[in-house]
A protein has these predicted regions:
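Non-catalytic C-terminal accessory region of glycerolipid acyltransferases
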Residues: 25-26, 30-35, 64, 70-73, ...
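Juxtamembrane/interfacial segments around transmembrane helices
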Residues: 115-116, 154-158, 300
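N-terminal amphipathic/basic-hydrophobic helices that include classical n-h-c signal peptides
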Residues: 1-28
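Active-site metal-coordination segments of metallo-dependent hydrolases
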Residues: 79, 177-181, 239-243
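Membrane-anchoring hydrophobic helices of lipid-metabolizing enzymes
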Residues: 21-152, 186-189, 193-195
């Protein structure tokens, strides 16, 4: 989930109380981030600084090369992606699944560059390349004055998609950090400039308070966070641990739920952002709500199957305790 699991020993941030909520604000960069242990990361960032200034078509080409390299190297993420695709697309032949796995890595390579672009450059120059569908849907929800839950998933264009929408709407996000301190510093600094508040996942009261103050809050609802915070609902026909926070927040706050998806089109170097209202939600049944949300996510994935983060362990927690990976 695009949520704040804060690793206090690695993250150069400070919690701040703002309007009654605990937000994540970046401090000035600690000198320890300049230690030799972090030089490889800084070198990659320096390279990325120049890469994101290339023409978009060359950024896409380079991203595909990076993805192919990661795929050839193999390792744990390749095994996870391969297993996920076998589980979710059993009707594909072995050759088709292998081709899709390769495309997933190519898309992931492009996403790495897109994420670097989001962190290192303003996205204004890309906005003419973005097709928005449903901006009026979100505007209508905001006008109701009950706040809005902007629910997403880990499609490839995650950070860039949020930045595109932030050019049109003021909203907050729930944030999950990386274990890399330098990456955390850069990404959190950028998110603080893009969004109204960057909220810790643990601050549920603050999240509800923001909704009641008519704020829109964005987060991803498609990762396996274990049994404690989940119910089991079908995802591609497989019972998957699915967070129940969306159902609970919608019930407590009365906020409308908007689903956001975002994809790239390599044929013309463009992107699309789609916003759709989730009707008749919540139902009062958390499993039914989770099933509906998974169905929506699955439908969007099927439209662009290579542009989903199949590299994460979506089926890490099983109802019977078995292991898929």
């Amino acid at each position: 989930m695009l949520a704040a699991v804060i690793h206090r020993h690695t993250v150069p941030f400070e919690p701040a109380i703002s309007d009654g909520i605990q937000t994540v604000r970046i401090r000035a960069m600690p000198f320890r981030l300049l230690s030799p242990a972090h030089w490889p990361t800084w070198l990659l960032i320096a390279v990325a600084f120049f890469v994101v200034r290339l023409p978009i078509r060359y950024q896409f080409r380079l991203g595909r090369l990076i993805g192919n390299l990661l795929h050839r190297i193999g390792g744990r993420r390749t095994r996870i992606a391969t297993q996920n695709i076998e589980l979710c697309f059993p009707d594909l032949s072995a050759q088709e699944r292998a081709r899709l796995t390769k495309q997933v890595f190519e898309s992931t390579g492009i996403a790495i560059i897109e994420t670097a672009y989001t962190w290192l450059r303003p996205v204004d120059a890309l906005l003419p390349r973005v097709r928005f569908h449903g901006l009026e849907v979100l505007q209508t929800a905001v006008n109701e004055g009950k706040g809005a839950l902007l629910v997403g998933a880990h499609f490839a264009v995650l950070d860039l998609g949020g930045a595109f929408l932030a050019a049109h709407f003021d909203f907050d996000c729930i944030y999950r950090t990386s274990r890399n301190s330098v990456i955390d510093h850069i990404s959190l600094r950028r998110r603080n400039s893009l969004y109204g508040h960057v909220i810790e996942r643990s601050d549920m009261r603050g999240t509800v308070r923001q909704l009641r103050q008519s704020r829109t809050i964005w987060y991803a609802a498609d990762q396996d966070n274990g049994r404690q915070h989940s119910v089991f609902a079908p995802f591609f026909g497989i019972p998957a641990a699915t967070i129940n926070v969306t159902s609970r927040l919608a019930k407590i706050s009365g906020s409308p739920v908007i689903f956001m998806s975002h994809f790239r089109d390599e044929s013309d170097c463009s992107w699309s952002v789609r916003l759709r209202r989730v009707e008749a939600y919540p139902t009062g049944d958390e499993i039914a709500d989770a099933t509906l949300m998974n169905r929506i996510i699955e439908r969007e994935i099927r439209s662009h199957p290579a542009q989903y983060l199949w590299l994460h362990r979506r089926f890490k927690t099983m109802p019977d305790g078995t292991r898929k990976y």
